Amino acid sequence: GKKKGEHSAIFYDTNKFELIESGNFWLSPTPDRPGLGWDAACVRICTWGVFKIKGTKFKFVYYNLHMDHIGVTARAESAKMIMNRIKEDKHKLPAILSGDFNINQDNDGFKLIDNSGILNDAYRIAKFRYLNMSTFNSFRPEGLGMDERIDHIFLTNNFTVEKYGELTDVYRTESVDANGKKVARAHTPSDHYPIMIVVNTKKNKK
């Protein structure tokens, strides 16, 4: 908060996963302390956690980030930074990377990650996909077509993706139209639709 920027939380089921270690780094030339990165408009962050699947020996690192919505250079450099972090990670574990990247699947930063030979786009490798509109909706329940898939999940080769889905649920509140008539208007909970995947580990089917 305040000058230290945002927080990219990782929610997990404590009945299924044990958190072993966690931390943050900032998407900037000074990753160990809060600060604007390159041409970014906001202070951006990546949160990580080392998890163990309870009842197994399988461990993995989960990264969750939020890239800047304005800075083109910031997004490109953030993609390079996260890949270097994963390559150099001391834990040497399977990894999952998710977040609001603010870049679509045609962007060079996206391709840098997906073509790295380390991480794979969950949408691309999923056995079953459900996605009928952009993940960015600008708070418009009707959505924005298919060009803005800017929220992504990437995984190392230690995982298979059984299902990939976009949750397009809306909620309704009572409002008044231009004629003074009460109507139920649809609203999205966020300006992004959440995406969800079902995965298996290649060594431990869970």
What are these regions (language model features)?
Residues 1-59, 167:
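Structured beta-strand-rich core segments of catalytic domains in phosphoester-bond hydrolases
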Residues 5-6, 58, 80, 200-206:
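N-terminal, active-site-proximal structural segment of metallo-dependent hydrolase catalytic domains
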Residues 8-10, 46-50, 64, 152-153, ...:
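Conserved hydrophobic/aromatic beta-strand scaffold that supports enzyme active sites
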Residues 16, 67-69, 103:
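Short, glycine/acidic-enriched loop or turn micro-motifs at the edges of active sites
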Residues 41-43, 52-80, 89:
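Metal-dependent phosphoester/phosphodiester hydrolase catalytic core
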Residues 62, 95-97:
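Hydrophobic/aromatic residues located in beta-strands of well-ordered beta-sheets
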Residues 65-67, 99-101, 193:
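Active-site metal-binding loops of divalent metal-dependent hydrolases
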Residues 73, 77, 86-95, 103-206:
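Metal-dependent phosphoester-hydrolase catalytic domains
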